Amino acid sequence: MEALFDNFAYMMEGTNWQMMVMWLIGGILITLAIAKDMEPSLLLPIGFGAILMNLPNVDLHIIDVLFDIGISEKFGELFPLVLFIGIGAMIDFGPLLSNPKLMIFGAAAQFGIFFTFFMASLCGFDIKDAASIAIIGAADGPTSIIVAQELGSSYLPAIMVAAYSYMALVPIVQPPVVKLLTTKKERMIRMSYEAKEVSKTTRILFPIVITIITALFAPMAVSLIGFLMFGNLIRECGVLNSLSETAQKVLANLITLFLGITIAARMHYSEFLNINTLIIMGLGLIAFIFDTAGGIMIAKLINLFLPKNKKLNPMIGAAGISAFPMSSRVIHKMGLKEDPQNFLLMHTVGINVSGQIASVIAGGLIMTLVYQFS
């Protein structure tokens, strides 16, 4: 019993208020995961890891090893890239392939990345850190991790937490922006959907062609888009069904779990608790807001040139962010709330998957620009 009290006293000796703040942050993330069902597969391990990394007098070398293997450049950012295989296997590009014009909304919804890059530079961050912070607007955790790691950002922990937190908060962040930028009449616009058959050949060629095009125009994004498209090729080829199911479920879930706990390896209070973390969280929110606004405004612009009976519901532009499939569902539900007979899901899904591609390419482009001008 005396030894137990000695150990307790020894632990309390090494405890400080910064650790307690990190315990609180970890507790909040766990609460959001369990009570609010916000990205539980990520926020739960991140929250628990934040507590774990800030316990006094504890040796957690194994988490550092996981970080070296899974996220550091030493092993080529293994976890995010492998996770892209699982994400690619989950995505059905059919709605996009049946209406390729939807790609414009995926591109427009990356506006927040470049706007936030400018804002972060004004806040005093150097070009590499500004680019790493801006990529939070990709609404894509793996892309945020890889870009920040490749550019050697000093703020990797805050960027990772901001990226995944805002992905989880899409149902909270997007609706106010959509309502601010659209009228009730616009939100009630109905859009017809004509299902077009997409051939198996097209589905197989699409990931291959996208990878080649990316290599030509944004070579820095090839590793990102390549793993994403490889996962989709596994899904669409038709001869690897069991492997496709494994990638979608077992592989994606396992890597997500490891990724969450590994992110926490850089959430020690000495790295995380500073004013720049708050600034980064604020800039991340700005990136999400302007991504959403970019998609909506391009839809409103297109409407100026369309006949009255062919108008687009501007809300669909907001689904162009990469948070798949959360954003498409959020916008669809908003449409149903305004008009119970307004079914926007097939439009929003197509735009959402185009945003997945666009965000990865944007990540590669921003890395290319930084390397050219730094």
Where in the sequence are the language-model features?
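Membrane-embedded hairpin module used as a gating/binding unit in multi-pass transport
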Residues: S165-V239
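Transmembrane helical segments that form the transport core of multi-pass membrane transport proteins
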Residues: I210-A299
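Entry/N-cap segments of selected transmembrane alpha helices
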Residues: P95-F117, Y269-I296, T348, N352
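Intrinsically disordered, low-complexity non-transmembrane regions of multi-pass membrane transporters
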Residues: M1-G14, M20, P176-L205, V239-E245, ...
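Hydrophobic transmembrane alpha-helices of secondary-active transporters
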Residues: L29, L52, G76-L97, G231-I234, ...
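Alpha-helical transmembrane segments
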Residues: Y155-I172, M281-D291, M315-A319
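N-terminal alpha-helical transmembrane segments of multi-pass membrane transport
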Residues: M1-I63
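Alpha-helical membrane segments and immediately flanking helix-loop junctions
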Residues: I85-M90, F105-F115, M119, C123-Y155, ...
